[in-house]
Amino acid sequence: MEEIIKALQNNEIIIVTDDENRENEADMICAGEKVTGEMINIMAKYARGLICTPIGKNIARQFDLEMMVKNNTDNHETAFTVSIDHVDTETGISAFERAQTIRALADNNTKASDFRRPGHVFPLIAKDRGVLVREGHTEATIDLMKIANLKEIGLCCEIMADDGHMLRGKAVVELAEKLGMKMTSVSEIKKYIKENNLDFSKNEENFLEKTNIINLPTDHG
């Protein structure tokens, strides 16, 4: 298989599936720091789900992003913060303005006051130890960003079928082949982290000094 991490570093969209006994869903995922309007448009067109922006806790603290609700009763406790738009956007909803807002999260010069609340970008806070403690697409996204030495800001979007139901199984593989997207799974990411003794909570700054490109094996070739 061609490298998942290299694809993310090359600003490509990949597909990540989760466990059949969890959500049993597939998400399109990409890095946030260089995301383009064209990439968000691809997600909106071919994935069709809610485009969200997984972030690390440090990013949430940096921009004072509070939780959307105090009492989270979501089935999987998805950690939505208040939604945002960058102040330089107009309505904030276009693919290009959403990309502008997300790139601003990765800009060291951006301040908390540079975002309007609520908005059209939906940050999700990943747990510190990632998929080792929560096997969700939020954590998978941020774990992949860390492994790839990218900023802890990504995008994920659930993939729906033409009929509006969730795309699953062989149909996900067929879509990945059609769009030329690399594919992996949450379980494969978790296995890689365990095999390489990566504990993200111990050294958030430089836990991956050893490699820039990692060959991440998958069941999909």
Label each residue range with its predicted role.
Residues 1-221:
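Catalytic domains of riboflavin
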